[in-house]
Amino acid sequence: MSLSKIIEFPFEHYLKKHTSPTGEVDFSELIDEFKKMGKMLMPKLGVAPKMPMEKMMEQMAKAKITELDYRAKISKEPIEKAFGEKSSSHNSSNVKVVPPPFVPYAIDILSNVKRTTKSAIYINVPFCQTRCSFCMFYISPYKKEESKRYTDALIKEMRMWEKSKSVGTSPVHAVYMGGGTPTALEAEDLHRIIKTCHELFPLANDCEFTVEGRLSYFTDDKIESCLEAGANRFSLGVQSFDTEVRRRMGRLSSKEDLIRGLEHLCSYDAAAVIIDLIFGLPGQNDENWGEDLKIVSSLPIDGVDLYQLIMLEGSPLEKLVKAGKMPEAPTKEQRARMYKRGFEFLLDNHFRDLSVSHFGKTFRERNLYNVLAKSDADTLAFGPGAGGKIQGISFMNVRSYEKWLEKIDEGKKSALMMFVPEKNWRLYKKLGEQVELGFINWEYFEKTFNINLKDSLKEVISQWQQAGLLLDKGKFADLTL
């Protein structure tokens, strides 16, 4: 017997009862009810009380950031010594986990909650022509016949949300097609996806529409299909221009291929062109990192992102390094110096620091999606493994491509996991957003949240100032390099 036949939960009554005048929904009571019902129903359904996925999510939810984690080591080189090794590309916080059997019901509720903030859409394309050794986002190898199959399913998934309150009429400020490698898709399918977004969703007049990809296989017909359909930003994962470093990582194009390809893409003069560089790759050194930066400054691109390599445990790259088949990666201190050099070089060459990782060369680059992703912004998410958030309630779609296809074929939303944040989540998100931008506006928090954050954090502020991480500028605090 299916859960839908057993559970009769008064969703409409709940929504009316627990929706505030501003349209925000309190999910805490609903989650508690789900947990009570779960304990009662799981034995009848033959479901183990502790499923592997649920256990994993519980461990994630219990991860706490203690005050000690924020205390910096005082030294003459704060950028190198202030903190320990970074172990994750995402922050964690205290959350309530929606038990997996009840996620389908919770996502139906969430899809009918109005967006109340600036908003984004994230589309995950699960394919790559090759797997890069440093990447943990790889899902599936690309096969030409999968392009139409995936696109048909994606459009069907987007149409499931089309008339929900979460789509509504509030403007969407940024759309990001990531992955994976979106540019692996066929030209006509790239066109269909972008065009469908413009047709189904209330995109703002100045909506930033990004297509992420690689220059390999990003042919003229694909470029022109994206532009014609309404994309206005391309984000290309260069990672390094050094051919030897690239080949070790599983990248196909040589330095010369990349330079020619970027110059050609920029010659269209119809969209912002941004590239990613990674610092800390095995085999990188002062010489080839400096050469990468010089090439960036010479190209007619609109911006560049500098990302630190996080060598995650169990990644193909970590295994290769451990086996001695790959050079050792630069140390934490070496990576810190590489970042500092990159930051200073870009500013000296008149790039604008849009955030701690993103730099604009022209005013075409706005970096909207990346800032929204760190903020309290609502995000609709489509595709296998895509993650979204509405009013602080975050969700992630099933990661397996085949299982995602099955869900969509059955006419069901594909969410697999959901998390309900703690009470002050919006304050924490706004603080995280400002730190990402390189400053903290104390006055903003006083006006918006009625809290003297500067006083509440005075011990941490004092400690960070001693460590050389923070400059007190009255109503602002600026982060140092």
Regions found by a protein language model. Give the residues of each.
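Flexible, acidic/Gly-rich N-terminal and inter-domain linker regions that tether
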Residues: 1-36, 40-119, 168
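C-terminal scaffold of the Radical SAM
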Residues: 111, 118, 140-164, 170-451
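Short beta-strand motif preference
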Residues: 121-123, 236, 479
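Local cysteine-cluster metal-coordination motifs and their immediate loop/turn environment
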Residues: 124-137
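Extended hydrophobic-aromatic, low-complexity segments
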Residues: 442-444, 455-457, 472
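Short amphipathic alpha-helical interaction segments
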Residues: 451-463
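A short, conserved structural fragment
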Residues: 465-475
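Accessory beta->alpha helical hairpin/"wing" motif in late/C-terminal subdomains of nucleic-acid enzymes
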Residues: 475-481
